[in-house]
C-alpha cells in the first residue's frame, strides 16, 4: 500500500493536487509544514522570509510535449503553432519560456494559451485548434490514450528535458519538484524524515518493479486511468533524491532561472541552509 502512496506523491509534483498559489498561501499562514512544491517555489518563499527549506527532489522532469497529428520534432518547430500550457508562470511555462529564450526563438511567434490546471488542459486539447499541449505525467499519457478513443491522432513531440539539456549544456534532467518543509518542523522531526526518505525510496523501487499493481493504487489518487499510469511512469522521471545529493544539479537549474527571470526565485540564489536533508 505504501508503494502506491509514494507514486501518488510523485504525481502531485506535476500539479496533481492544488495550485502553486494555494501552496504559497498555506506556507505564509503557517498552516502547511510539509509540502510538495515546484523546486523554484521553495527558494522564492525562503527569499521572502518564510522559514522553509528543501527536503528532496521527486522528479527530474515530469512534463511532456504532446502533439496532435504529427509530432513537433524540435523547439524551433513550435514557431507558428498553438500550444496549451497549464499554470502560467509556473514550472511547465517557465521551462518552455526559458528554453525558447535560450535558443533565441521569438516567443511571440509561438501562440500560447494558458489553462488553469493540467486536467483542464487535457479537456481543452482535443476540441480546439491546438497543435500541442505541455502536460505532466500521467496526464500526458492520458491525453495520448484519450486521443485514440475519440479518433484523434495524438503523439509525443520532442523530449522537453533532453532539449533543455542540449540547450543549456546540462545533464538531461530538470529537478522540477519535490518536498519542502518548515525548517523548525524538519529539525524537530529529523528521525521521522529519515524514515520517510527510506520509505519513499522503497516505494519508488516497488512501483518500478510492480507497475500494474502500482497503477491500481495510483488511479485512486491521480486524475488518470490505470493504463496511463503504467505507460507514463518512465516519462515521469521519478526519483527520490535528498536535496544535498543533487545540490549541484539544483543550483545549476537555479542559475539558469536567475538568468531567465530572477523573480522566479525571489531575486537571489538560496543560502546553504536551504538544503535541509
Predicted feature descriptions by range:
Residues 17-21, 36, 86-94, 119, ...:
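Soluble non-cytosolic domains of exported or imported proteins
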Residues 39-41, 120-217:
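Pocket-lining segment of extracytoplasmic ligand-binding domains
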Residues 107-110, 222-234, 265-271:
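Short, surface-exposed acidic
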Residues 251, 255-277:
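Conserved C-terminal helix/tail region of periplasmic/extracytoplasmic solute-binding proteins
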Amino acid at each position: 500500500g505504501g508503494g502506491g502512496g509514494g507514486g501518488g506523491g510523485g504525481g502531485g509534483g506535476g500539479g496533481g493536487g492544488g495550485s502553486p498559489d494555494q501552496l504559497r498561501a498555506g506556507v505564509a499562514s503557517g498552516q502547511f509544514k510539509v509540502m510538495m512544491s515546484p523546486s523554484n517555489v521553495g527558494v522564492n518563499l525562503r527569499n521572502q522570509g518564510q522559514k522553509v527549506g528543501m527536503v528532496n527532489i521527486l522528479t527530474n522532469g515530469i512534463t511532456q510535449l504532446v502533439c496532435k497529428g504529427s509530432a513537433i520534432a524540435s523547439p524551433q518547430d513550435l514557431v507558428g503553432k498553438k500550444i496549451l500550457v497549464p499554470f502560467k508562470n509556473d514550472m511547465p511555462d517557465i521551462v518552455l519560456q526559458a528554453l525558447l529564450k535560450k535558443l533565441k526563438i521569438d516567443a511571440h511567434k509561438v501562440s500560447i494559451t494558458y489553462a488553469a490546471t493540467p486536467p483542464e488542459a487535457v479537456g481543452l486539447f482535443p476540441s480546439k485548434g491546438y497543435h500541442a499541449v505541455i502536460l505532466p505525467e500521467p496526464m500526458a499519457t492520458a491525453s495520448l490514450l484519450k486521443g485514440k478513443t475519440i479518433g484523434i491522432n495524438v503523439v509525443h513531440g520532442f523530449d522537453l528535458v533532453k532539449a533543455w539539456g542540449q540547450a543549456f549544456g546540462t545533464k538531461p534532467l530538470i529537478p522540477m519538484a519535490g518536498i519542502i518543509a518548515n525548517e523548525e518542523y524538519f529539525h524537530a522531526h529529523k528521525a521521522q524524515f529519515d524514515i520517510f526518505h527510506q520509505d519513499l525510496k522503497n516505494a519508488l523501487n516497488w512501483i518500478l518493479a510492480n507497475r500494474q499493481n502500482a497503477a491500481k493504487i495510483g488511479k485512486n489518487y491521480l486524475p488518470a486511468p490505470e493504463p496511463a499510469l503504467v505507460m507514463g511512469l518512465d516519462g515521469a522521471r521519478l526519483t527520490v533524491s535528498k536535496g544535498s545529493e543533487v545540490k549541484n544539479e539544483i543550483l545549476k537549474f537555479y542559475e539558469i532561472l536567475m538568468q531567465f527571470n530572477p523573480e522566479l526565485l525571489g531575486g537571489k540564489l538560496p543560502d546553504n541552509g536551504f538544503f535541509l536533508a
